[in-house]
Structures are given as structure tokens and as C-alpha cells.
Design a protein with these regions (language model features):
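Secretory targeting and sorting signals
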Residues: 1-30
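N-terminal pro-sequences and low-complexity stem/linker regions of secreted or lumenal proteins
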Residues: 30-368
């Protein structure tokens, strides 16, 4: 396991840093559109993120019958795209509205020219600081008096700053054999999350997810990230199960599909699903297998959106529409904008504000 620890800082220093984030990168004030205003308020939204699969690999149904069943019964965004490759920046885009120039899977603490095995691309020209001084969705929610939490299967401990980790008692190994990977955290790339005094309550494991669902005490926004065997990413090395080997994508899809089905059923069995309040589960992917197609302002020269491929995205709601196949072009910025609307936040983070480029809320899938 590789871990990173920052030096302790004073309370005054933490306050100055927090104020700097707000001052440097406050979200643009944009007038919401009629569609933004039409998105109903949601009490709870769970976003489950899977990995590295093309739209057709999932939606042809051969290896993902549970996900296809959910798509047909509830709703599917049939033209949804990632922003870039590889994984890490798409997670950052989902909660921050930008890739911030990150175009690799180096650790969240990496800086230009840094000598570290976790920062293998750091001497590449134009390398971006992987710790971002900008607000994220969690900051917006807290400012609105709402709650958020990231649930990560096999995170070593609540609030952990480990870059990779195996499950307790699991096989030792490096990144290729890791079950938990901080590159899929989304939030840890933000300085405010790294320095969050409540980080151990905001970045937690799946035992906390089980407890929260059983009690019904779940946050407004929940990012749910299975381990690399259960999110279709796969792994490679000694002790890796056959259905987790990334050289067998059909097997990793079947395993991930069964796991997503279990997660969705668990959420639907929670008291929050039976509530009169609106709740939703979004199942999406970070990127496809490597194509550079995109939407909503995608440009080969864009650091924020050069195209992360056509990916499946399914929206399951407790009170919303049924049987919807929505062909509107969307990406993770569209999903972020939809989340902001659903929680009554009318300021859109960075590229979530790109309505002129086609970044619009996913209203047909969330309307009631």
C-alpha cells in the first residue's frame, strides 16, 4: 500500500486555504434555463461509477442483463460521453466541472517535475498539478446546507490518503493488482477535500454504505465506487480472480453487472426509496475503451473535453419516469449540472455552465 501524508497545518492556515479556493475559482453565475428550473428537487441521488466499457459492450445485453433491464424499465441516456482519457480526470470532471488539465492517472498529490513512483508522468511538458484549488460539488452542497459522501469499496480506512490498497488479507501488489485506487476518488484531487477536517466522514467504505442504507440516514449526494474487480475495470496479477482479469472484458462486465444489480437492490430496499421524497440512482462509466468521441463542445484540442468515448448511463428513480430512452447528447458535465439543479443549486461549476455548447440538464430522465 502506498500512502501520502501532508504536513500538519494550523487552523488559520486551513482557513486561508479554504478562502483562497473560493476566491480563485468561484463558480460562474449563470441564469438557469427553463429546463434547469423544471428539474424536480431530489432528496437523495446515488451515482454509481463503473469503468472503461463502450456503450455497446454494456447495452448489447449479452453480459450485462441486469443493467439493460434497469435501462429499459427506468431510463437510459443513449448518447452519453466521457470527457477525456484515462480515468482520473473523468471523475474529477463529474464533481468539479473540469479536468483541470489532468490527462493521466497519477496520484492526486502529484505536481510538475515531482520525483515519485506515483507521479510517473510528472516530467511531461504541460503537466498539471493534480491537487486542484477549486470548489467541487461537495462544497456546493455544504454551502446549501446539504450533505455528501463518497463510498469506496476496500478503502483502507475512512478518510484514507492511500493511493492504492488491497482488501484486508488480500494479495499484496502494486497498482495493477489493487482493489482500491484513489484515482477513482474524484474528491481527493481537490485541496479542500484533502484538508477537510471531516474527511473521515466524507470518504468512507462500503460498511458505512450498508449502515447508512439500513438506517435511512444517507447523504443528499452519494458517490458509490466499487473496487476494481466489481467496477468492470479489472486487475492483473497473483491472486486475481478469473472474472476480474482485465484481459477478459466479458467476464469483468458480467461480474460488474451482478454487483451493480446487488447495489441497486440494496438501495431500493432502503427506507429512502419508499419515501415520498424523490430519490435517484445513476449508473454511469468514466470512459469507454479508448475512442476519442464526445459531445457538448468536444474538441480534439480541448484539455477539458477532447472526447472520452460513448458510454452507457442509466437513471433509476423512485417516483420518476419509466421506460425512457433519451437520445439527447450528454456528458459528465451534463450530469453535474443536473445534480446541481436537483439540489436547488443555481450556480454551475465551470464546464457544467457550458449551455451554449450543449451542456444541458438530463430533464427527461429526472422529471416527475
Amino acid at each position: 500500500m502506498t500512502a501520502f501524508r501532508r504536513p500538519a497545518r494550523s487552523a488559520a492556515g486551513a482557513l486561508v486555504a479554504a478562502l483562497a479556493v473560493t476566491a480563485i475559482a468561484a463558480p460562474a453565475l449563470a441564469a438557469p434555463t427553463a429546463d434547469d428550473l423544471a428539474v424536480p428537487r431530489y432528496a437523495h441521488v446515488f451515482v454509481i461509477v463503473e469503468e472503461n466499457k463502450d456503450y455497446a459492450q454494456i447495452m448489447d445485453g449479452a453480459n450485462a442483463p441486469a443493467i439493460v433491464r434497469l435501462a429499459k424499465a427506468y431510463g437510459s441516456a443513449t448518447n452519453f460521453y466521457g470527457e477525456v482519457h484515462p480515468s482520473e480526470a473523468n471523475y474529477v470532471a463529474l464533481v468539479g466541472g473540469d479536468t483541470f488539465g489532468i490527462h493521466d492517472d497519477d496520484a492526486f498529490f502529484c505536481m510538475p517535475a515531482q520525483d515519485s513512483g506515483d507521479c510517473s508522468h510528472a516530467k511531461t511538458p504541460g503537466y498539471a498539478n493534480h491537487t486542484v484549488d477549486a470548489p467541487h460539488l461537495g462544497n456546493q452542497l455544504e454551502a446549501a446546507g446539504l450533505s455528501w459522501r463518497g463510498y469506496y469499496e476496500d478503502i483502507p480506512a475512512p478518510g484514507s490518503l492511500a493511493t492504492f490498497a488491497t482488501a484486508p488479507g488480500g494479495e499484496a501488489g502494486g497498482p495493477n493488482a489493487a482493489l482500491y485506487a484513489s484515482k477513482h476518488s474524484a474528491f481527493l484531487n481537490f485541496r479542500s477535500a484533502q484538508n477537510d477536517p471531516h474527511r473521515a466522514d466524507h470518504l468512507v467504505g462500503f460498511s458505512r454504505l450498508d449502515a447508512d442504507l439500513a438506517s435511512g440516514n444517507v447523504p443528499s449526494f452519494a458517490l458509490v465506487v466499487p473496487n476494481q474487480c466489481n467496477e468492470m475495470h479489472g486487475a492483473h496479477g497473483p491472486g486475481i480472480p478469473a472474472d476480474c482479469d482485465w484481459n477478459d472484458p466479458s467476464a469483468t462486465i458480467r461480474r460488474g453487472d451482478a454487483y451493480v444489480d446487488k447495489l441497486v437492490r440494496k438501495i431500493q430496499a432502503s427506507p429512502v426509496w419508499a419515501s415520498p421524497d424523490n430519490a435517484a440512482i445513476v449508473i454511469t462509466w468514466d470512459e469507454d475503451s479508448g475512442t476519442r468521441v464526445g459531445c457538448c463542445g468536444s474538441d480534439p484540442a480541448s484539455a477539458a473535453n477532447f472526447g472520452g468515448g460513448h458510454i452507457a448511463t442509466v437513471v433509476v428513480t423512485n417516483h420518476g419516469p419509466r421506460g425512457v430512452a433519451d437520445p439527447t447528447p450528454y456528458n459528465h458535465y451534463s450530469l453535474l449540472r443536473t445534480l446541481e439543479d436537483a439540489f436547488g443549486i443555481r450556480t454551475y461549476l465551470r464546464h457544467a455552465d457550458d449551455s451554449a455548447k450543449g451542456v444541458v440538464p438530463m430533464l427527461p430522465l429526472f422529471r416527475r
